[in-house]
Amino acid sequence: MQAVYILSAVRTPIGKFGGSLASLTAADMGVIAAKAAIERSGVRPDQVDETIFGNARQAGGGPNVARQVSVRSGVPQEVPAFTVNKACASGMKAIALAYQAIALGDAVCVLAGGTESMSRVPYLLDQARWGYRLGNQELVDGMYRDGFFCPLAKMVMGETAEVLAGEYKITRDEQDEFALTSQKRAARAIAAGRFEAEIAPVTIEGKKGTAVFNRDEHPFPDASIEKLAKLPPVFSNSGTITAGNSSGITDGAAAVVVASEHFVKQNNLKPLARIVAITSAGVDPRTMGIGPVPALQKLEDKHNLRLHDFGLIELNEAFAAQLLACDRVLNFNRDRLNVNGGAIALGHPIGCTGTRITVTLLHEMLKRNTRRGVATLCVSGGMGMALALENVV
């Protein structure tokens, strides 16, 4: 099996809920990331064999967002495209499927990524199609129905984090301290321009004219432990999960161009990283946040890759309690973990995140000349996924 490489890795800035990107559809944002990824890769659009994009909140976004992104990005209409929904891991699964297609010889160059507009998730009228005759009817929030609530666990996502906090004896203070670290690291990274190389600016047409959006807008640089401590628990009066120690509801897109070793050599291209291994695992839906643990353990069991082999680790911060539960089991080196902050500060645009953390990981590996890195995340419904990279620059 020949090696599979990432040629480019790009993302939009992440917009807060109802913020700068709220007017754009998931497809709109995906096109921006995809065009930038193609341009930076050195690949022509007509050299792409397939387009694969993750998108988790699909209601109202039009059919097959990946196909919309592909055609609008200049990829020929003869090139197929499909959309992946693996909830939080959708964007990472898109990369995994690109990797598998190339490894099997079904493709030599694939455009992959993830995109999400959480701001545009619609409300639902469940029975309106057949008519309301008598009685009270409810307006259903699509964000709750298709995201926050897990029908397997019969719980909302934050309640699963409370389960982990109780099981692993994770205090509110620990969670708030971790959340503050995420905010401070992200603020330092933004101030130092560490995300600039991975971001494709977004031009937005508004009532006051054209504006260029080029910085993540969800972080709170003035966060403090005192401010975090004042926030009430969300899911139970005696709970520990707050808006401050949870990931943000946000919008964004990210994309990569993936290619075979033969294609890279044939076209004299300069890859950024080699995809070393990808794993996925299932866990109890009630403790879905522990999913990265078996996913990372599979890297060791199947590929002999141990945690200490990775100079950098990007673990999506769905909740501080969730990440800290994983830390209780695996004992991460905190100096290698989410070095520029994570989803608590930056946000978690669901279908985008799996690609976003891969993009951020790769760029930080290049800056630090880190040989190997791993991106991993938990997945609603009770799963985990991990993707290991090797720097080849």
Located regions from the model:
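Short glycine/threonine-rich loop-to-helix capping motif typified by GTGT followed
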Residues: 59-64, 211, 215, 285-292, ...
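Conserved active-site "lid/cap" helical segment
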Residues: 1-61, 65-73, 77-80, 160-172, ...
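Active-site nucleophile and cofactor-binding loops and adjacent substrate-binding regions
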Residues: 81-90, 245-249, 275, 288, ...
